[in-house]
């Protein structure tokens, strides 16, 4: 699916991107378009708001084992380990760029009063979501004239989710526990 869609994905995403899920979302949108869908709900939001990403769970597990600085989170979400970054960047380049860790910490400074995992959730909701995750469904849907709606990002729902204590968001190593538990009321548990 990559070779036949790469030009379309690059054109509609408006930038080169290393995220393979653009292609998967485009394929999903093609199937929806073929079936006459013009407006579709997506599931964007709960991973960011309810700290449902695997790296969030790893962060929480590490927090329970040791005092884990947020710099470690930054290094986990980077695509390249710091040792490799150091090998690729020459001295002149390094002198003229913003230190990514300093920049990351300046973003998080707005949420210094929150627990580290809640700082990460705030960052992912305000930076990662709009800068990456929401772009995928929006632009790949638009490529086929499909309007995507994100009901979990309604400010009323987001505000409720944000008030839920972290201990209730991840239970028994199940991410988005409350959402999944609530959803089971509507679906067969054997699905």
Model regions: which residues?
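Short Ser/Thr-interspersed hydrophobic loop/turn segments at strand-loop and sheet-helix junctions
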Residues: 125-139, 161
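Short, surface-exposed acidic
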Residues: 187-191
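ATP-dependent adenylate-handling active sites, centered on carboxylate activation for C-N bond formation
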Residues: 1-120, 139-186
């Amino acid at each position: 699916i990559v070779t036949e869609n790469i030009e379309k994905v690059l054109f509609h995403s408006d930038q080169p991107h290393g995220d393979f899920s653009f292609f998967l979302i485009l394929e999903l949108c093609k199937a929806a378009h073929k079936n006459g869908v013009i407006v579709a709900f997506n599931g964007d939001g709960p991973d960011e708001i309810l700290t449902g990403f695997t790296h969030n769970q790893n962060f929480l597990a590490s927090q329970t084992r040791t005092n884990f600085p947020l710099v470690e989170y930054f290094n986990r979400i980077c695509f390249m380990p710091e040792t490799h970054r150091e090998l690729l960047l020459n001295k002149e380049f390094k002198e003229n760029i913003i230190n990514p860790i300093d920049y990351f910490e300046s973003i998080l400074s707005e949420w210094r009063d929150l627990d580290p995992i809640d700082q990460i959730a705030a960052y992912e909701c305000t930076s990662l979501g709009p800068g990456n995750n929401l772009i995928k469904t929006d632009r790949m849907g638009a490529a086929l004239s499909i309007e995507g709606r994100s009901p979990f990002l309604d400010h009323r729902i987001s505000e409720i989710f944000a008030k839920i204590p972290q201990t209730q968001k991840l239970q028994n190593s199940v991410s988005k526990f409350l959402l999944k538990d609530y959803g089971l009321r509507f679906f067969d548990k054997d699905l």
